[in-house]
Amino acid sequence: MYFGLSEDQIFFQDNIKKFLEENSSVDILRKIAADDRTFAKDIHDGIVNLGINGLLVPEEFGGLGLDILFAAAISESLGYGAGATPFIGSYVMAPIAIIDGGSDEQKQKYLTKIVSNEVKFGVGFSALTGARDNSEIQIKGNKISGRSLFIL
């Protein structure tokens, strides 16, 4: 039995590595950190153009409908080139949560927006104190704001 990556997975990895080699550097990452940004929009948009945003989204919603192993291969490539992008939260955790727990209406609304790059999701999973404290969460309109120890 073969346990290596498929040709398609290797192709995706190679394209992302090449893009990051050409467009990301330590100097760029330092500038992002100095500007207090979480990611570089131009680098992120370039990686999105390679198709990562629709990776796990089913084809019926405009995505590629691939599996979590594909996401792991992409994650490895992003780490190789220090790709500062909201990959895990927006393109792995959010689609999985919406697919598994969302209504048909929510799937149509949000999965298509993930694929079209209209939205980016963040996933917070621990309060600043490490304990669950809903008083730190504020809702303004349909957006949640607040602080958390870990945001992906």
Language model feature labels by segment:
Residues 49-108, 112-117, 152:
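Internal helix-loop-helix
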